[in-house]
From Swiss-Prot:
It comes from Staphylococcus saprophyticus subsp. saprophyticus (strain ATCC 15305 / DSM 20229 / NCIMB 8711 / NCTC 7292 / S-41). InterPro entries: Metallo-B-lactamas, RibonucZ/Hydroxyglut_hydro, UPF0173, UPF0173_UPF0282_UlaG_hydrolase. Pfam families: Lactamase_B_2. Keywords: Hydrolase. Belongs to the UPF0173 family. This is UPF0173 metal-dependent hydrolase SSP1060. GO terms for molecular function: hydrolase activity.
Length: 229
């Protein structure tokens, strides 16, 4: 399995011949190494509706006829206002099998909206974390979230091989809470810090996160680099 990081919270993987992207914030993301106008994907998975996660979803979905997997509210928004053909609505606690693997959404503590052309926030359902079961590996993408103790429950139910976790602070966990989550609750084999350095408000030194983590291995990835299993 190819599993790579592409700036902010965007991850991409290929499994069983399918190409999948999570939170495709490409255009306007100074960290991204991808080109939304040429990227080919079969599936798009969204943790929530904020612009730095929703990103290029509409273009990618319509050009590729890709299936968008996300909250029911996000699905309704895409089909009603943007003519996206293929949507799979899900919600927290729900698990579904796809031809690339299994997807389960779990809790995240954040918010979820998108600002329309009139500057009005549109509610897009609950923010969610994401459990992926792919080719014998369990991947936990926490989404944007603060620290919460049920991360331990999530990891108890789904022992984690790779955890993508935000460290940017201000809008999500910072390094102190993220490292606590890894050390005390999630305890993955591999931790990958995300959601930092994209904007001034979330500038962080990922090496401080690495120094604070005492469980498993921390892999600090540059955009375009693969997780090393």
């Amino acid at each position: 399995m190819k599993l790579s990081f592409h700036g902010q919270s965007t991850i991409y993987f290929e499994a069983n011949g399918k190409k999948v992207i999570v939170d495709p914030f490409i255009t306007g993301n100074g960290q991204s190494d991808l080109d939304a106008s040429t990227l080919k994907v079969d599936y798009i998975i969204l943790t929530h509706g904020h612009g730095d996660h929703f990103g290029d979803t509409i273009e990618l979905a319509n050009r590729n006829h890709a299936t968008v997997i996300g909250s029911a509210e996000l699905g309704d928004y895409l089909t009603t206002y943007h003519n996206v053909e293929n949507v799979r609505p899900m919600n927290i606690g729900g698990k579904a099998e796809f031809d690339f693997g299994n997807v389960k959404f779990v809790q995240a503590f954040h918010s979820s909206s998108l600002t329309d052309e009139n500057g009005v926030p549109v509610y897009l359902g609950m923010p969610m974390g994401l459990i992926l079961e792919i080719e014998g590996k369990t991947i936990y993408h926490t989404g944007d979230t603060g620290l919460f103790s049920d991360m331990k429950l999530i990891a108890d139910r789904h022992p984690v091989d790779v955890c993508f976790i935000p460290i940017g602070d201000n809008f999500t966990m910072g390094i102190d809470d993220a490292s606590y989550a890894i050390n005390s609750f999630i305890k993955p084999k591999i931790s990958v810090p995300i959601h930092y350095d994209t904007f001034e408000l979330i500038e962080q030194d990922p090496n401080k996160f690495k120094q604070a983590v005492s469980v498993g291995e921390v892999q600090i990835l540059k955009p375009g680099e693969d997780v090393s299993f």
